[in-house]
Amino acid sequence: IMIVRHKLLADLVRLWKNDELVEKIDRLPIELSPRKSKPLGRCFVHKERAVWRYKTFPLMGLDMTDEHDEVTPLSEYARLALSRPEPDKENIMCVIDEACSSCVQINYEITNLCRGCVARSCYMNCPKDAIRFKKNGQAMIDHDTCVSCGICHKSCPYHAIVYIPVPCEESCPVKAISKDEHGVEHIDESKCIYCGKCMNACPFGAIFEISQTFDVLQHIKKGEKLVAIIAPSILGQFKTSIEQVYGAFKEIGFTDIIEVAEGAMMTTSNEAHELLEKLEEGQKFMTTSCCPSYIELVEKHMTEMKPYVSTTGSPMYYAARIAKEKHPDAKIVFVGPCVAKRKEVRRDDAVDYILTFEEVGSILDGMDIQLEQVNSFSILHTSVREAHGFAQAGGCLLYTSDAADDRI
């Protein structure tokens, strides 16, 4: 799924680079799924082409609500994406209804491995009498009666009963995604914490984050100043040296690069100071404020935890202000790994746009930039090792504790 998404965005960027996005985007679904090609899990090639068409929407910063007439060509949407002054979408993620397979909401099914045994453990243990029997003695489930308790699944000695999940719903920790009356999944923004699990779980790649790639690229094409503030976890994203990765950002057209790890140093110091103050006031503990997905979880599902969340800004918050001070007339673009940061960027006036590492990889491919061949770019003020440690599990806790020293 990631490969498909990467390729599609790279193809769009390639058209943009050659000033052919509006002119040739309508041919893209046909080129990706020629008449004699084998559909990728779809029933026929025309369905596959329709899926390609609608998957371009979120990659251009649009969603399904932007389509008011199905006969409107993609070129019109491409023109809209390139001409808008600012991103105007309130939602962070969207479901491509044409790509959603409307997974059947049946959690348990008895397979033909059923031996029609005498013990009939499934029948004897079912609390709702939902087990029926065929003429050949094999069991079957009456889904109108079944409550999906799973007791039959556990009791079958032959493991002939299988659990069939709806992958996106199964992966969501807060039950923010569910089907509408047409069987298509929808994300409830009032519940969603933007963890991105549903996007990774969907086997059909029907869930997308709404990209700002072309907003960023258009500013670059206009010759405007853009500063990339890059999360330290980029060290594990590409195979070349970090200096070559930074050089690639210069090749794309960024004016300067600032490590978010610089902001992490300030977060560590300020959060340690805040922790000591809270403990002195009698508060028993304090939780981090660095993860926007966690912040959403607290605000929407664990409101009793609000008093314990740190008020210290995240590394991105401080890095953006460092960038603004150094380049007051530039647009600030946060570059990071996760969906949830899109929500934090919306809240932070100092950050203008966001790109994920995946989008950066597609931009590099689309612009034919080879990481191994670019000139290295070194940052004058590199951050200390501890600041880069924020990217590892438990890094925030470890280095905040170290900053507080033996006072806690």
Map each language-model feature to its residues.
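Single conserved hydrophobic/aromatic residue that forms the stacking wall/gate
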Residues: 399-408
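Phosphate/adenylate-binding glycine loop and adjacent helical scaffold
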Residues: 338
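A conserved active-site cap/scaffold subdomain adjacent to cofactor or substrate pockets
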Residues: 353-357, 367-370, 380-398
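Iron-sulfur-cluster electron-transfer modules
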Residues: 144, 158-321
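Short beta-strand/loop segments at the ligand-binding rim of alpha/beta enzyme cores
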Residues: 328-332
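Hydrophobic/aromatic beta-strand patches that form the interior of the parallel beta-sheet core
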Residues: 258, 333-335, 353-355
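A short secondary-structure junction signal
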Residues: 299-300, 343-348, 365-366
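Ferredoxin-type iron-sulfur electron-transfer modules and their immediate structural context
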Residues: 1-155, 159, 165-169
